[in-house]
Amino acid sequence: FDRMSKIGPCVSIFGSARTPEENPHYNLGVDLAEEPSKRGYGIISGGGPGIMEAANRGAQKGVGQSVGLNIDLPFEQNHNPYIDSAHNLEFDYFFVRKVIFVKYSQAFVALPGGFGTLDELFEALTLIQTNKIARRPVVLVGKDYWSGMTDWIQKTMLDAEQNISPSDLDLF
């Protein structure tokens, strides 16, 4: 907490570790991180490759703070070279890492990803929905990618089952 408290306002960017550099989503991740970084926001990613690397790369291009919240996994997750050395944090548990994502971010951006991306996204949405954290922007990038999920949320969770409120659709 002490290291993060010195960074200032941040934007968290979620996305797949498996996205290669030649994928258009990678370049979009770089661009999306660069803009808030130029405006003084730190960029927080999961610290790994793929979209996470793209986010940290964009943070460095924008000369902002580049933070990586790396998780110790038996496969796939090594920290990327675009994290500021003072802001490369290592975690053993996902729930602790998610606390840091949520506590220090003023906005959340989700690019295409897998189960980890969904876990981070729904953690943020749930905490906003239940007023455990203040309302802040949650942006889903890539309409084609997310439309199946957002349609399901509306048609199944809201319309068919009434498991969420109509206002919950305004969270993202």
Regions found by a protein language model. Name each.
Residues A17-T19, G113-G114, D144:
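Residue-level signal for short, function-critical loop segments
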Residues F1-L69:
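Glycine-rich beta-alpha loop segments
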Residues Q60, E123-I128, Q154-L158:
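Short, solvent-exposed amphipathic alpha-helical segments in soluble enzyme
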Residues N56-R57, N80-P81, E120-E123, D151-I153:
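Short amphipathic alpha-helical segments
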Residues E53, D119, S147:
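Alpha-helical elements of the RecA-like P-loop NTPase motor core of helicases
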Residues D92-V141:
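Active-site/ligand-binding-proximal alpha/beta "capping" segment
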Residues N27, G50-A110:
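Acidic/glycine-enriched connector segments
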